[in-house]
A protein has these predicted regions:
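Glycine-rich nucleotide/cofactor/substrate-binding loop typically near the N-terminus or early
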Residues: 37, 41-127
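N-terminal glycine-/serine-/threonine-rich phosphate-binding loop
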Residues: 1-46, 56-62
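Alpha-helix boundary/interfacial micro-motifs
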Residues: 28-30, 64-67, 131-132
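Hydrophobic alpha-helical segments and helix pairs
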Residues: 112, 118-148
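Glycine-rich loops and low-complexity Gly/Arg-rich segments
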Residues: 31-34, 68-72, 135-139
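Conserved small/polar residues in nucleotide/adenosyl-binding loops
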Residues: 149-153
């Protein structure tokens, strides 16, 4: 029988807010995904990274802000997104591989990092609903304009 392909979408709150919560929730997701593999499905997984990218961006910004020697700069959002995708994908890949091996299933598991394309003229930017990172004053934001990567502009 040919495997049917399905997409599993793990949403915003699927992983929790802390690393221990994420490890626990990733393990539960891996068990459910392995159940689907046992039912002969080919799985494609997509996931949110909102809370995680926000935590990374906040940490990187605060670290750069507190660095009196100015050895560190603020990481652009595109890199923070890649970092969060990378570590979430890494955790998922390892948990799924472990769960499959524990069940005697020898299938490859891999992670692909994606890029997000944002329309800078999207009207949603006029009324943001979710804060990512530290809230800045107008003066701080204006001073940071020169820090944008071309890919972030």
């Amino acid at each position: 029988m040919k495997e049917k392909r399905i997409v599993v979408a793990l949403g915003r709150n699927a992983f929790g807010e802390t690393f221990p919560e994420q490890k626990k929730n990733v393990k539960k997701a891996a068990q459910a995904i392995a159940d689907l593999v046992e039912q002969k499905y080919q799985i494609v997984i997509t996931h949110s990274n909102g809370p995680q990218v926000g935590m990374i961006q906040t940490a990187m910004t605060e670290f750069a802000r507190l660095d009196n020697d100015k050895n560190y700069t603020v990481a652009p959002m595109s890199l923070c997104g890649a970092m969060s995708e990378g570590y979430i994908g890494y955790d998922l890949q390892n948990a799924i591989r472990t769960e499959l091996l524990d069940r005697g299933i020898f299938k490859p598991v891999s992670t692909i990092i994606t890029q997000v394309r944002v329309d800078p003229f999207d009207k949603a930017f006029n009324h943001p609903t979710k804060v990512i990172g530290r809230v800045m004053t107008r003066e701080e934001a204006d001073a940071k304009d020169c820090l944008l990567y071309t890919s972030d502009a």
